[in-house]
Structure formats: structure tokens, C-alpha cells
């Protein structure tokens, strides 16, 4: 429940106001508002005068603060009073609908989650009830339910705010949170939402990469060019997941490219292998484990040693889906390692002409 949806705010009353003040506020609004708008004010008054409903409004209101500071906070201002974790989280929740996510605010919210206390909220509510003349709150266990609702609302609001960020900024924010080591409830919700949002594109890119590896068997240059393009996008999308979980997120793609590099170096020669391992290094050098493997492979390749293949990374389907959005494979000039196949073709054609052309 946001401040501006709260019955206290709708009636312009505070949690220290009694039944008479609530009735007076309702009468005042009825004089000012058109008849069709009276329903919301009447419902707000009914909510505050029924004790079983009132407690929720009290929890999501700056109860415990003086009237001036409470309304200042509700309007988005800064109170001079020291705020409890609950009130700081309420302020954070209300800012999410208008503000962009900031790293400092998220880190503070994670700390406030840990310090959130049902007893502190209960004390604020009971104090204001005594001033208002309402009976004491007799079911303190209900506060824990409101606390969970607050956490869920903040999670939903933060996810919505993260989706409004530019794509690159959203990824940077998640990576920064992971590097801070603050992997609490809020961070987990944000990362899970991001993973769901990019799941479809990552799956498509994995298929594109498998397609590029497939065509590289007959067209190494074109396959490598397409592979570089699709892998860069895949790695960009995967960086927040890598920051959280480590290299295993990228291992399938890395292993598939490495195995193809080994296969092509054995079939087409060392120069082709060097170019493929150079691409592998360009893509994955930021991962220490992969960088070490690539360096070791490059040394073995230079020495003419046989390179051990790893497990196949990307799961092979019975029938590879040919991407519809790839209209043609990239056109590239033949490099040194591929020219010999052209020479072989010319020689074969010449022999055929000599044998059968006469």
C-alpha cells in the first residue's frame, strides 16, 4: 500500500487522530468533493474506524512520527526525525514508482530488511492508538503478515523499476550488486526477474551459436564471423548471471566453441586453429578459468601437440532449428588456411578434364 493510497492520506488525517477527527474530515470532504467521488472518502473512513482493517493502514503509514513529519514523508519530502527501518523501507517503496533504481538505495534497503522488526512497528502503532483513543492492538502476530507484504511489494516495485531502466544500465546495476556481496532477498528477486526476461533471447542465441558452429564445418570463415557476432550478444546478456554464479553459466558455449576450434585445427591445420583460439581468447579472456585453459591450448597448438577435447557444451538436438532471422551467412574473404581447398578443387577439375574431356 503506497502512501497516496492509504486511508489516512485520502482523508488527510494522521494515525493520532480519533474517531471524531475522522468523522469531521469525512464531512469536510463531502462538502468539497462531487457526489461520484464521495465513495472513496467514505470507504477510507470506514476502514480507519474498523479495528480489524485499521491496523494495515497504520503499518503502511508513518505511524510513530509527528503529524507534520508524517505528511512530509508521505509527500516525498525529507523528515528531520530519525527513521526506523520500516519507515525507510516505506519511503523506498513509494519512491520506486517515480524514481529510477540506484545502487546505494538498493544496498540500504537490503540492510533495512535485515533490521526490520515487527515489535518496533507494533510499538509505533500502539503509541499512536493511545493518543487517538482507540483500543490497544490485540493481535501482534498480524504485524508479521504486513511485514511480509511490505517485502513483497518492494520486490515487485523494484522489479518494475528495473524493467524501466535501459538494458545496459540494468545489467550494470545487477553486476554491481553482485560485486558488493549483498545477495539478499531483493537482489535475488531482481536477478530472477532479469533471468526470466532474457531467457527466450538467450535460448535463441544458443541455437544461433550452434548453427554458426555447424556451418563452420564447411565454411570456417563465415561460421567464425557469425559466431563472433552471436557470442558477443550472448555474453552481454549473461554477464549478470556470471557475476552471481560464476563460469558454469558460460561453460556450455565456451566448450562448444573450443571443441570446434580443436576439430578445425586438426582438419584444416594449425593456422586455422590459431585464428579460432584467438577468437576464443577475445570472447572469454575475462573469465580466469577459461583464460588459463585457452593459454594452455595455444601453447600445445604451437608445439604441435594433440589437444584434448572436453564434453560437448551446447546440447545437440536431433534437428537443429535453422534461425529464420539469419538470412545469409556472412561474406568474408578466404584466408590462408582455407585457400588450399580451392587449389584442391582446381586440381581435381583439371584432372577430370584431362581424363574425360577428350
Residue ranges of model-derived segments:
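Intrinsically disordered, low-complexity regions enriched in small/polar residues
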Residues: 10, 136, 148, 355-358
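Amphipathic alpha-helical protein-interaction segments
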Residues: 22-23, 40, 44, 64-335
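Alpha-helical transmembrane anchor segments and their immediate juxtamembrane flanks
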Residues: 335-358
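N-terminal J-domain/J-like co-chaperone modules of DnaJ/Hsp40 proteins
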Residues: 1-36, 40, 44-47, 53-55, ...
Amino acid at each position: 500500500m503506497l502512501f497516496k493510497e492509504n486511508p489516512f492520506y485520502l482523508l488527510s488525517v494522521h494515525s493520532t487522530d480519533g474517531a471524531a477527527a475522522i468523522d469531521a474530515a469525512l464531512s469536510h470532504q463531502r462538502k468539497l468533493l462531487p457526489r461520484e467521488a464521495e465513495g472513496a472518502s467514505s470507504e477510507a473512513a470506514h476502514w480507519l474506524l474498523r479495528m480489524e482493517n485499521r491496523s494495515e493502514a497504520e503499518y503502511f503509514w508513518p505511524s510513530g512520527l509527528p503529524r507534520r513529519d508524517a505528511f512530509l514523508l508521505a509527500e516525498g519530502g525529507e523528515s528531520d526525525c530519525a527513521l526506523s527501518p520500516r519507515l525507510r523501507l516505506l519511503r523506498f517503496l513509494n519512491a520506486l514508482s517515480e524514481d529510477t533504481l540506484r545502487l546505494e538505495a538498493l544496498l540500504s534497503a537490503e540492510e533495512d530488511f535485515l533490521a526490520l522488526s515487527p515489535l518496533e512497528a507494533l510499538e509505533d502503532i500502539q503509541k499512536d492508538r493511545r493518543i487517538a483513543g482507540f483500543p490497544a492492538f490485540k493481535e501482534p502476530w498480524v504485524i508479521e503478515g504486513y511485514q511480509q507484504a511490505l517485502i513483497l511489494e518492494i520486490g515487485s516495485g523494484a522489479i518494475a523499476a528495473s524493467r524501466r531502466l535501459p538494458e545496459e544500465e540494468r545489467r550494470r546495476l545487477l553486476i554491481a550488486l553482485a560485486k558488493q556481496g549483498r545477495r539478499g532477498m531483493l537482489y535475488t528477486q531482481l536477478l530472477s526477474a532479469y533471468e526470466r526476461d532474457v531467457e527466450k533471447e538467450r535460448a535463441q542465441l544458443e541455437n544461433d551459436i550452434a548453427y554458426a558452429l555447424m556451418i563452420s564445418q564447411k565454411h570456417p570463415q563465415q561460421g567464425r564471423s557469425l559466431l563472433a557476432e552471436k557470442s558477443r550478444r550472448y555474453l552481454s546478456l549473461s554477464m549478470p548471471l556470471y557475476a552471481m554464479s560464476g563460469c558454469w553459466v558460460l561453460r556450455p558455449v565456451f566448450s562448444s566453441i573450443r571443441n570446434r576450434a580443436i576439430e578445425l585445427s586438426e582438419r584444416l591445420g594449425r593456422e586455422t586453429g590459431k585464428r579460432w583460439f584467438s577468437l576464443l581468447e577475445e570472447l572469454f579472456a575475462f573469465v580466469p578459468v577459461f583464460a588459463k585453459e585457452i593459454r594452455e591450448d595455444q601453447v600445445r597448438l604451437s608445439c604441435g601437440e594433440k589437444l584434448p577435447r572436453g564434453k560437448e557444451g551446447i546440447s545437440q538436438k536431433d534437428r537443429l532449428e535453422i534461425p529464420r532471422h539469419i538470412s545469409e551467412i556472412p561474406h568474408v574473404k578466404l584466408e590462408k588456411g582455407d585457400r588450399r581447398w580451392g587449389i584442391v578443387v582446381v586440381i581435381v577439375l583439371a584432372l577430370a578434364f584431362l581424363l574425360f574431356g577428350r
